[in-house]
Amino acid sequence: MNDIELKTIARDGKARLNEVTLNNKNFQTPLFMPVATRGALKSLPFNYLEDTDIILANTYHLYLRPGLEVIKEFGGLHNFIGWNNIILTDSGGFQGWSIPNKFNDDGIEFKNIYDGSKFFMDPTLSMDIQQTLNSDIAMILDSLIDINKEYDEQLNAIQTTKNWALKAREHHSNSNQSLFGIVQGGKHKELREKSATDMLSLDFNGYAIGGLAIGETQQERKEIVDFTVEMLPQDKLRYVMGLGDIEGMLDLIELGVDIFDLSLIHISEPTRLRRISYAVFCLK
């Protein structure tokens, strides 16, 4: 795994402005990551994002099309799409929730959305795909379930996520790639605490808070994030997955969150967030 250098240069309560260095590339947080699902933005050229530091690409979709052999011929995703800044790849966990599938303790059986065939994604395959893509930041495969599921189901999901995280951590071997753990647990603070403890024990390069923006109220989300952030280390990035509206991001920036993403968002939002973040921290 590749360490991320993080320096907090300004604070406003729990909110923080960080200078971050990864693979000789520098960026500041808080930031929003535009989602380039298959390595491209819909209806927009990459030069539209010339001032953007990070994009998110989708492991599930890139694995299916164009496929790893094509991307491998280019030496990785950066060269394939002509992107010189940072790429974060998700693991396939969200598609495990959003696309009809079958979960078991070993992984997720998917139906290929292009041809209907079935394939099985487990923690090691997810790592193999992301290491072949050679993204700067990879995510572990996690067990994402509806936030309103019962306690026992949430408990099983965090145990599965822990087991998958351990397998991913052991399998990961790309020294140029950072690896993030994911904290799950639904609305239950004791499960969020247990999941955070599980992730911290594996000493990842950064930590995501997952399972949000899929059914909870705004107040519930703030309480979950506030509680969880307090358990995460100051010297690691904090990433709330799947949230990218301005009001929602500002709520969580105030609680110390650094990174956000959302596929269903107007492309002008990241630029607006950047302006707001400068105002929040009164840099001048």
Feature locations, PLM:
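Non-catalytic, usually N-terminal nucleic-acid engagement modules in DNA/RNA processing proteins
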Residues: 1-173
